Amino acid sequence: VDRPAHSDAALSRRHALLLAAAAAAGAAVGSSATAHAQADPIVDDASLERALPALSNWGRWGPDDQLGTLNYLTPAKRVEAAAQIRTGRVVPLGWEFGVGTPNLRDFSYEMRSYTDEPPEEAGSLDVVQLNCHGFAVTHVDALCHIYTPGGRDGMYNGYSVDNATDSGSAVLGIEHVGAVGIVGRGVLLDVARVRGGPLPVGSAITPDDLEAAERAANVVVGEGDILFIRNGAGPANTYRHGSGLHGSCLPWLHDRRVAVLANDSDGDVHPAPAGFDMWPEPVHMVGIPYLGLTLLDQAELDGLSAACAEEGRWTFFVSAAPWRFRGGTGSAVNPLAIF
């Protein structure tokens, strides 16, 4: 496993990120990120750059960590989350897709029928090729999916981009997520419901929106939560026009110690808000390589919203099991919410 071996400046920057994260690791929840957010809110590239040391989780769980914020999902948190199962109602959170689904990337499909020699077992097999990233498939991003800008500071936790080859990544692959799963308390912050309907595509969700949705749901997002944020536009979100979280939400997510962030889009605003030219997709460009935040993109949240309203609560048990493909950058997934 390779560590960064770039310029002295890059090594110095990595050292600063490691020190900042290590110092923050023992702090009380909310102290570092909230103070930074109040003193220097993220409004553009420059303020985001200044926030990186406070946002970084490099070294928080040791120099060899490959789970990032999934470390917040402890066995105790999973046991606690099991109490969310009261009625047994199951809601799928992955979009159904197949041949004919628009916007699938690098997709091909072939069904092959067969009949064996006597006793003539008959059936069919299929072969699927799919790029799970993008807006058509519900998927989980591995921490090797997005590097620091240009890869100059490596990947999450300081791993070198040289670990990524044509055969996959030697570190931070999706198999690490698959080994522990995404299992815990889910919380839906239904921003669309609070605002009175689906957000116009291209809208930015702010920390104020998140806290308004918290109040409406009478919940508090906390350490180890699997956070779902609904903008309501669903498949209408695209790389051309899509709703998501403003960069100013990053300290909020860091402060709350969210384990997994899930959206009914890719989580970023498209096109990027004014001032974010170097960091146009902060949820991905900062969330993955600096926070070590596991992202669950393009979830189907309309059904979840309806179920929460009917059940009268906005918390539930979540189980999702990405595949254990070594070195993979992500996995299609169908998370299940259980009430």
Summary of predicted features, one role per range:
Residues 1-12, 19-29:
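N-terminal secretory signal peptides
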Residues 13-14, 230:
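Basic side chains
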Residues 38-339:
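Active-/binding-site microenvironments in catalytic and ligand-binding cores
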Residues 18-19, 144:
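Intrinsically disordered, low-complexity segments enriched in polar/charged small residues
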